[in-house]
Every structure is written in C-alpha cells, then in structure tokens.
Regions:
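Short, low-complexity disordered leader/linker segments with a strong preference
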Residues: 1-67
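N-terminal (or domain-start) structured segment
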Residues: 47-123, 129
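An extracytoplasmic/periplasmic, membrane-proximal ligand-sensing/linker region
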Residues: 64-68, 82, 210, 214, ...
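Extracytoplasmic
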Residues: 65, 94, 104-107, 114, ...
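Bilobed "Venus flytrap"/periplasmic-binding protein-like clamshell domains
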Residues: 65-93, 97, 155-221, 331, ...
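Acidic, polar ligand-binding/catalytic clefts
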Residues: 117-153, 235
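Pocket-lining segment of extracytoplasmic ligand-binding domains
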Residues: 124-126, 134-137, 165, 201-293, ...
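Ligand-binding clefts/hinges and TM-proximal coupling segments of bilobed small-molecule sensing domains
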Residues: 176-193, 264-337
Length: 356
C-alpha cells in the first residue's frame, strides 16, 4: 500500500467521499474543551516564517527522501477522506505518502507505537487513556511515545435507536442489546465511559462489539436496540437510518453528562443541532476532539516541515469534508490538546504565535 501513486490515492479519496457524508513530557494541566470554532479567515491559513526568515523544516532534497504513512479509518467513515487529504497535501509539498485504511482510533494508536504510521488520526479520550495507562489501557505500559501534531475536528457521541424500542434516555438501555463499537475501539471507549457516568456497566446491558455500521444493520433487522456512534456531523449511516426508519437520537444529558465532563476534561457538552437528522429539536450530547498523532522518534525538523506542508496546502484538506472545512485551521490547531506536543510541533506553533 505504501507504493500508491498520487493518482491512486486521489481515486481512493473520491470513492471514500462518495461513500460518506458524514474520534513526551508530563501531561499538561487539564483544560475544558472549547466549542467547535467557526471557520477562520482564509488568510490565517498561511504559516508565518520563523524569525530570521528561514524555515526550520527540511530542504526539498531531504523531503523527497521521506515516506509518510497516514493512519486514517474505515473507508466508510470520515477519517478516511480527511486522512487521505492530509496525505495528498503532504505529497503536494514534496513527500512520498500513503493513506492507510484502518479500524480508526485503536488501531491508529497501535500503529503509531509500532512505527507503522508516521501520523494518524485518533480521538483524544482514547489517546489520553493510552498515554496514562488508564481505562481501556489499564495494566499496559503508558504509551509515552505518543505525541500530538495538531487538533482536528470534534467527534460527537451519538446514541441512536428506533421509536419502537421505547428508549428515550440513557438509563433505558438497561436490559437492552446495545451496539457499543468494536472492542477497544474509540467508539467502545466512549460507550463504556458514558454508560459508567450513568451508573451502568456492561453487566446491565447486552453489549454487541460491532462497528456502528454493522450494529445499525442489526438494528434494522431487530437484532439490536440501540447503537453508539462517534463521528463528525452528520454521519451518513445515521442519516440513512433516519430516512428508512422512525429513528430517535437519544440525549446524553443531565447528571450523567455533568459527571462525565467533570471527571474527563477531554469531553465537552454539546448539542446535535435540530434537523441534523430527523430530529426536529436540538439534542443534548457530548463531543471529544480528534487529534493528529505523530511518532515521537520523528526528527523535529521533519515534524516542523510537515506542519508547514499541511498549512501550505490546507485548501486540499478543507475540501475533503465539511468537518475538516469548519474545524481544521491554523488559528485553532493547537487549542484543547492535552497530549504533549512533539518538540517540532511545539516550535512550529510557537513560531506562528499560537503558543508562548
């Protein structure tokens, strides 16, 4: 796969976009995530040259020798086209690149740690659990080789069901068959944490460890009662469900939500706006940011150079998906990141005036 040509990569991106319309040093002090920002002015997307006028990145000759594999996600999801656009942007800057389809967050974290990817998309809650060896990663060695490159877009945790189940709140999931995501995936980590905030464990439900697309198919066949989905908005699979069935988007609200965001600062309160799906009113919920991971052992110069390339070709990335267009921008690319930045990223963001 690492031998993909630029033409094949572009072709794969087109297919993916057609399939979807819509997860170092010491840990910094927790910060409350901000709401997703509005798009910045286009002029802000051009990185400034560091003081002295010379880039701290690579030369053209050095860049041409490097190969970057970008860890994305399933071809049916949002990670794939956006990750593919990152690969294209870096290719336009002079790198050889490949966008690798994966099972998303969980596999991307492992691929970074194994050295199978240079950069990869992942949800920050799972990343921080891996980094601190807590939650789903309890008992494992802390993943101290993970570093952050930049913040990406918010993933909204969505709980969907159909009207005939009678499920209208999280507490109604007790005794029900629930699609919680593939085992140890970003979605499954979200599901487990949210259920716990409401005092529910997997012993109280019948968990189905399936990717949300498969779980929604089971729900259509009456073999599943509710499904957790974590993605940008809107999600094409959820939209299709809402067209074909009397779908209900279950709110994640009240004391359970308060407990969740209090205990885990990478979650923030949000709403799924009215008419995102078949919901006629806003639905209370939570989101968690995706971040771009980078291998700790990459040189500072290469990481700095990758960021220069990303923002030199940011229009390529913004064109890949609505979530990227609204949320990936240099003006807020370092906000709300709790994982330590790679030193090369630290230098880039400092030189451009976004950290001090």
């Amino acid at each position: 796969m690492k031998k993909l040509t630029a033409l094949l990569l572009a072709f794969c991106m087109v297919l993916a976009l057609a399939a979807c319309g819509g997860g170092g040093g010491s840990t910094p002090a927790p910060a409350t995530p901000t709401a997703p920002a509005a798009p910045a002015a286009p002029a802000a997307a051009t990185p400034a040259a560091p003081s002295g006028g010379e880039s701290k990145g690579l030369t053209d000759a050095e860049r041409a020798k490097e190969f970057i594999t970008v860890g994305t996600g399933p071809t049916s999801g949002i990670y794939y086209p956006i990750g593919g656009a990152f690969a294209t942007a870096l290719q336009e800057y002079g790198y050889s690149t490949s966008a690798e389809a994966t099972n998303a967050t969980g596999q991307n974290i492992q691929n970074i740690l194994n050295g199978d990817c240079e950069i990869a998309i992942a949800m920050q809650d799972a990343v921080m659990q891996a980094y601190t060896a807590t939650g789903a990663y309890e008992g494992k060695d802390p993943a101290s080789d993970l570093c952050a490159l930049m913040r990406l877009w918010p993933n909204y945790v969505q709980l969907v069901t159909t009207a005939n189940t009678g499920i209208t709140k999280v507490e109604d999931l007790r005794g029900k068959r629930v699609g919680v995501g593939a085992a140890n995936s970003g979605v499954e980590i979200n599901a487990r944490m949210i259920l716990a905030a409401y005092g529910i464990t997997y012993d109280d439900i019948q968990p189905d460890y399936l990717a949300y697309g498969e779980a929604i198919d089971n729900m259509k066949n009456g073999q599943c009662d509710a499904v957790f989905v974590t993605s940008g908005l809107p999600n094409a699979t959820v939209m299709e469900l809402g067209v074909q069935y009397d779908m209900v988007v279950v709110p994640i609200d009240g004391a359970g939500r308060d407990k969740l965001v209090s205990e885990y600062p990478y979650y923030a309160k949000s709403v799924i706006p009215a008419n995102t799906y078949n919901n006629t009113e806003d639905v209370e919920g939570v989101f968690v940011y995706n971040i771009m991971l980078v291998r700790k052992d990459l040189s500072d110069a290469m990481v700095y150079d990758m960021l220069e390339g990303i923002f030199a070709n940011i229009s390529t990335i913004k064109a890949s998906h609505n979530a990227a267009d609204k949320n990936i921008d240099i003006t807020f690319g370092v906000d709300d990141i709790q994982l330590p930045l790679h030193p090369g990223a630290q230098a880039f963001w400092a030189d451009n005036g976004y950290i001090h």
